[in-house]
Regions:
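Acidic, histidine-bearing metal-coordination/catalytic regions of metal-dependent phosphoesterases
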Residues: 1-50, 70-72
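Surface-exposed intrinsically disordered loops and tails
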Residues: 20-22, 163-167
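Active-site neighborhood of divalent metal-dependent phosphoester/pyrophosphate hydrolases
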Residues: 43-59, 68-165
Length: 167
C-alpha cells in the first residue's frame, strides 16, 4: 500500500541549504492508501486490457473504459499511438495519463510499448522517463505467472524525408 505526499521546496541555494514548506497529502479525501501489485510468479490465468490508437483523446479513453472492472485485470497494455506526437510531459498527462490515473493507473500496472507516433515530437526522447522499461528499452519479455508477454517496439513507419515530415 502507498500514499502520495508532496513537500514544497521554497529555496535551494546550495546542496547543504534547503528550505522546505509544508507537506500535503495529495489525496487526503481518499481516506485509504492505494494498493499496489506486482506480476505473480506462478499461475496460468491472465486477464488484461490492450489500449492503442487513442491519439490523445482522453475523453474517448474514459468513455471506452467506462464499464471496465480494472480490479479484475492483471495489467493494462498501452500498445502504441496513445498520443499523436510527444511534445511535452504536460501534453502526455492531458492526452491520456491524467485519465488513466483517474481510471486505473494508481493501482493497476501498465505495460507500455511505442507506436509510430510516440517516436515523433520534440519530447519523444524523454518518453522513457514516464515509462521506464527493462534496461531503458520499450521492448522486452515479461512473465505474468506462466504467461510470457512479448513487447515489440516497431518504431517509425516512414523515412525522415517522407512528405509527412516536410522532407
Amino acid at each position: 500500500r502507498y500514499r502520495i505526499f508532496s513537500q514544497e521546496v521554497q529555496s535551494w541555494p546550495d546542496v547543504n541549504n534547503v528550505t522546505y514548506g509544508k507537506t500535503v497529502d495529495a489525496d487526503a479525501a481518499r481516506r485509504r492508501a492505494y494498493g499496489f501489485r506486482t506480476f505473480p510468479a506462478a499461475g496460468s490465468a491472465c486477464s488484461f486490457l490492450v489500449l492503442n490508437d487513442i491519439h490523445g483523446k482522453a475523453d474517448y479513453l474514459t468513455r471506452l473504459c467506462k464499464h471496465v472492472d480494472f480490479s479484475e485485470l492483471g495489467f493494462v497494455a498501452f500498445n502504441g499511438d496513445m498520443s499523436s506526437s510527444v511534445e511535452s510531459g504536460e501534453q502526455l498527462f492531458k492526452a491520456y495519463l491524467d485519465a488513466s490515473a483517474a481510471l486505473f493507473a494508481a493501482e493497476t500496472p501498465i505495460l507500455f510499448t511505442r507506436g509510430n507516433h510516440e517516436t515523433r515530437g520534440v519530447f519523444a526522447d524523454s518518453l522513457g522517463d514516464y515509462f521506464p522499461g527493462q534496461d531503458g528499452r520499450f521492448y522486452g519479455i515479461y512473465r505474468y505467472g506462466d504467461v510470457c508477454i512479448l513487447l515489440l517496439d516497431c518504431g517509425e513507419d516512414k523515412p525522415d524525408d517522407h512528405a509527412e515530415y516536410n522532407g
